[in-house]
């Protein structure tokens, strides 16, 4: 009882390390194994909380050694040990703990569950990434008789490790493994093309050698493309994450006519109180004019212009801070919300971007603002919320049918992310009729037409 009281008192007065030590004593003295297990784990967590990492690792290691069950808690604790060793740059112990996690999961039997598979899959991925890194660092140098077998063996080991991850049936980790398999093939292809050439060859011999290397290398590039495309098609089953986007980015570089299709937007509002959209080639009145109804002082206008100038000069965070202040000072001025949302988007803060753009839409003057709706469509796409992205683009076009930014982006969404070629062709052709000088979209139309014909 005294020990328990001390543990409580030390915790209350902020002496967390001393509280952890008392928890260890409670664990050692407890007759009930459940109490002992809980106290020991609590002690480790308290050490970890205070940054006493060596002590935390020691207690956690005692825990996993004494208490193999429940398996999921054992696995979670092993992850904490691994994280500590990673933070301490102790790679050997870090990878040892990951290997232990995989082994524990493989022996889980009836105790297996989604949490255990997730932890094991991520551990296996980290181990496979090490295999990939080791393989990628191998250079093909002369004599080939020595370096080529090492490179091939490294490739085989990396692919075997990555393919084993699929068995865990964890969607995000499967996508990561598939991405790395494709990159393994691509690295082997590039390594062949960039390999050291033999010396003392005539120009004719060298030309023949170059052709031979290319014949060997390009099939591996084709394999890389096929695997990246398989990962991309995984998205069409409803899975979307950073690894699928990474595969799509690689495909954009390898097959640009098919995959290099990037959304764009009108960008920042240049005026705090007036927005005008003039359709391309139009000579009559603007297609849309929006005028702010909230009062705007000269000081507010000056602060808005300052934040805009900061963004133009690449001073992202100061501008975000200033725009956040403006939205709190005058929450009814739509332009500040809009530019704050765009700035957060540019900074990669997608959730914050969505929040501020939605705030703008809630204001009467911006309820159907095409800039907001189009920017929000891009944000939704990046968040994997494709149906909402489509709704947002269509809302922009409902407000202003001539708004070419939304039209182009809707075509890309249908093409790359919804696999709806009819929609893609319709939007691309409508866009191209209004923007005939965009040669890139003309190429996309030809690409979609070819795929529809097949």
Predicted regions and their residues:
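Residue-level recognition of tetratricopeptide repeat
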Residues: 8, 45, 70, 83, 129, 172, 299, 333, ...
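Canonical tetratricopeptide repeat
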Residues: 5, 39-42, 80, 180, ...
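Alpha-helical adaptor scaffolds
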Residues: 335-400, 405
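Alpha-helical segment of the N-proximal tetratricopeptide repeat
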Residues: 137, 145, 293-329
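TPR alpha-solenoid repeat register
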Residues: 2, 36-39, 73, 175, ...
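Position-specific recognition of the canonical hydrophobic site in helix A of tetratricopeptide repeat
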Residues: 11, 48, 86, 311, ...
């Amino acid at each position: 009882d005294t020990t328990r009281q001390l543990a409580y008192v030390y915790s209350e007065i902020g002496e967390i390390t001393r509280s952890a030590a008392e928890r260890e004593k409670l664990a050692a003295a407890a007759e009930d194994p459940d109490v002992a297990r809980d106290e020991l784990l609590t002690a480790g967590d308290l050490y970890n909380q205070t940054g006493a990492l060596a002590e935390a690792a020691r207690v956690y290691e005692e825990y996993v050694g004494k208490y193999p069950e429940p398996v999921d808690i054992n696995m979670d604790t092993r992850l904490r040990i691994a994280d500590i060793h990673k933070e301490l740059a102790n790679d050997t112990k870090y990878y040892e703990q990951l290997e232990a996690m995989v082994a524990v999961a493989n022996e889980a039997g009836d105790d297996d569950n989604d949490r255990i598979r997730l932890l094991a899959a991520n551990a296996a991925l980290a181990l496979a990434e090490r295999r990939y890194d080791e393989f990628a660092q191998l250079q093909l140098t002369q004599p080939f008789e020595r370096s080529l077998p090492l490179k091939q063996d490294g490739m085989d080991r990396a692919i075997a490790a990555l393919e084993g991850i699929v068995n865990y049936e964890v969607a995000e980790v499967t996508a990561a493994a598939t991405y790395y398999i494709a990159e393994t093939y691509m690295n082997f292809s590039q390594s062949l093309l960039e390999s050291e050439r033999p010396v003392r060859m005539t120009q004719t011999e060298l030309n023949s050698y170059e052709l031979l290397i290319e014949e060997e290398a390009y099939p591996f590039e084709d394999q890389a493309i096929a695997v990246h495309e398989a990962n991309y098609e995984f998205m069409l089953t409803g899975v979307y994450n950073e690894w699928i986007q990474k595969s799509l980015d690689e495909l954009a570089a390898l097959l640009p006519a098919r995959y290099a299709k990037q959304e764009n937007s009108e960008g920042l509002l240049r005026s705090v109180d007036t927005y005008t959209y003039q359709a391309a080639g139009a000579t009559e009145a603007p297609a849309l004019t929006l005028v702010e109804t909230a009062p705007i002082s000269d000081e507010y206008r000056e602060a808005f212009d300052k934040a805009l100038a900061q963004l133009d000069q690449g001073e992202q965070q100061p501008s975000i801070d200033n725009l956040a202040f403006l939205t709190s000072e005058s929450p009814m001025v739509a332009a500040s919300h809009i530019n704050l949302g765009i700035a957060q988007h540019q900074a990669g803060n997608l959730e914050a971007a969505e929040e501020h753009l939605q705030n703008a839409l809630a204001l009467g003057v911006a309820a159907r603002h095409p800039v907001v709706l189009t920017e929000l469509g891009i944000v939704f796409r990046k968040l994997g919320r494709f149906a909402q992205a489509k709704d947002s683009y269509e809302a922009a076009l409902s407000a202003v049918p001539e708004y070419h930014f939304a039209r182009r982006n809707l075509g890309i969404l249908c093409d790359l992310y919804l696999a709806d070629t009819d929609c893609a062709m319709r939007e691309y052709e409508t866009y191209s009729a209004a923007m005939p000088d965009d040669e890139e979209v003309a190429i996309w139309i030809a690409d979609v037409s070819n795929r529809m014909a097949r």
